[in-house]
Amino acid sequence: MAAPKGNRFWEARSSHGRNPKFESPEALWAACCEYFEWVEANPLWEMKAFSYQGEVIQEPIAKMRAMTITGLTLFIDVTLETWRTYRLREDLSEVVTRAEQVIYDQKFSGAAADLLNANIIARDLGLKEQSQVEDVTPDKGDRDKRRSRIKELFNRGTGRDS
């Protein structure tokens, strides 16, 4: 049954739209801390084979679980888009920054201690080794001559003129 035309029932609502998931920075930080505690309390498990007195036994070994922004947003039940919006909100941006720093530090420290795969974490954190190659050829004119000679030989081999 539809509402009668011209009704103004919507004015009787105490608020419009759904209530925000986190109404304060403290509530968001508390939810983030719950995620951090959950990650620490729930490591990943790997089965390792050990040999003792000729008998092979398998034992579960706890492995560090890497914190992620995706894991955090799933845990606190918000989308990545909402998380990015929180980053822009004046009241929540400090909490978002702090949470992202905790996640970065946990990953970096875990990789440095060889508790997490350093290659995967380095890529995730945007870390890379850089080397810079500098041309130290003393006479740049010689380089240009070599280039034009190489181009000439290449073109002769392919049958092109230029």
Swiss-Prot record:
Listed Basic and acidic residues bias regions = 137-162
Q: Which InterPro entries match?
A: GP3_package
Q: Which ranges of the sequence are annotated as binding DNA?
A: 143-152
Q: Please give the function described in this protein's UniProt entry.
A: The terminase small subunit binds to the packaging initiation site and regulates the ATPase activity of the terminase large subunit. The terminase lies at a unique vertex of the procapsid and is composed of two subunits, a small terminase subunit involved in viral DNA recognition (packaging 'pac' sequence), and a large terminase subunit possessing endonucleolytic and ATPase activities. Both terminase subunits heterooligomerize and are docked on the portal protein to form the packaging machine.
Name the domain of life: Viruses
Name recorded for this polypeptide: Terminase, small subunit
Which Gene3D superfamilies does this one have?
A: 1.10.132.80
From which source organism is this entry?
A: Salmonella phage P22
Q: Provide this UniProt record's keywords sorted from A to Z.
A: DNA-binding, Late protein, Viral genome packaging, Viral release from host cell
Is tRNA processing given among the entry's keywords? Answer: no
One GO cellular-component annotation of the UniProt record comes to: viral terminase, small subunit
Subunit structure comment from the entry = Homononamer; forms a ring-like structure through which genomic DNA is translocated into the capsid. Interacts with the terminase small subunit; the active complex is composed of dimer of terminase large subunits and a nonamer ring of terminase small subunits.
Region called Disordered, residue ranges: 132-162
Give a Pfam family name: GP3_package
Instruction: Please quote what the entry notes about the protein's domains.
Output: The N-terminus contains a helix-turn-helix (HTH) doamin that is involved in viral DNA binding.
In residue numbers, the region (Helix-turn-helix (HTH)) covers 7-27
Give the family per the record. Answer: Belongs to the P22likvirus small terminase family.
Task: Tell me what gene encodes this.
Answer: 3
Q: What are this entry's molecular-function GO terms?
A: DNA binding; identical protein binding
Q: Give the taxonomic lineage as stored in the record.
A: Viruses, Duplodnaviria, Heunggongvirae, Uroviricota, Caudoviricetes
The region called Interaction with the terminase large subunit gp2 is annotated at 140-162
